[in-house]
Amino acid sequence: NQNSSEAAVRGLYQLQSFDLNVMMGRYRGISRVGFSGQTLVANAYKIYIEIGTQEEHSIYNGSKKSYPVQSLLGVGYEGSQDFTLRFEYFENGQGLNSEEFAQMMRMRTMFPSRFGGATSLSTPFVRQKFLIASLSLPEVQKKYNITASGIGSLEDDSALGIFRFEYLVGDRFIVGLSQTQILGQDGSQYQYRSFDSQTMADLRFSF
């Protein structure tokens, strides 16, 4: 859109052991604002929070605006050079609440051709409340990176697990292998998933 303008401003502030960050701006015609803060406890435990919102227009009334809030609260253990462990609670204000989700499922049942086999995995956050856990093992024996992550919905019986293995061939060359596992019963956000399990391999070379 040639008539849209884009601008952003960011502020950083340190209050004793707290790091605070505020950002606001307009990107692709959408106003956005966000806040984040973090602190380190006992030189090992990182506690952090992120809150953000952006302008949205109703799909039923283009002139009606809303500002759904997304928030994340997390705690991570970073007291070891061998691994990091994180647990997070994510509330997705842009996701579907129970009534909206039920309406979407009815629409899929009544008009399956409209969805054309599309999968809910365009985003793992279709609903609103999630728990996230991740474990990272960097440079195991100076040759491997290993990461395991899990996302679980608190509103239906669905979960997503991701395991990634990287082999450090050299300073600029990495061979990666990723495995994604999906769990979702009928009526969950992953009911219309396109796969239950997926394996992907990739090569990365930096110049």
Give residue ranges: language-model regions.
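Transmembrane beta-strands of outer-membrane beta-barrel pores
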Residues: N1, L15-S17, M24-R28, T53-H57, ...
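Residues that define the transmembrane beta-barrel architecture of outer-membrane proteins
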Residues: N3-A7, Q14-Q16, G29-V33, K65-S71, ...
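Loop-centered beta-sheet repeat module
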Residues: L12-K46
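Structural signature of outer-membrane beta-barrel channels/translocons
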Residues: L12-Q16, Q38-V41, G76-S80, S136-V140, ...
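Repeated loop/turn-to-beta-strand initiation elements of outer-membrane beta-barrel proteins
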Residues: L15-V22, A44-Y48, D82-L85, Q141-I146, ...
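Extracellular/periplasmic loop regions
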Residues: G34-S36, K46-P138, S149-G150, Y190-Y192
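Outer-membrane beta-barrel "beta-signal"
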Residues: L131-L135, Y167, F173, Q181, ...
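C-terminal/domain-terminus segments
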Residues: K143-L168, I174
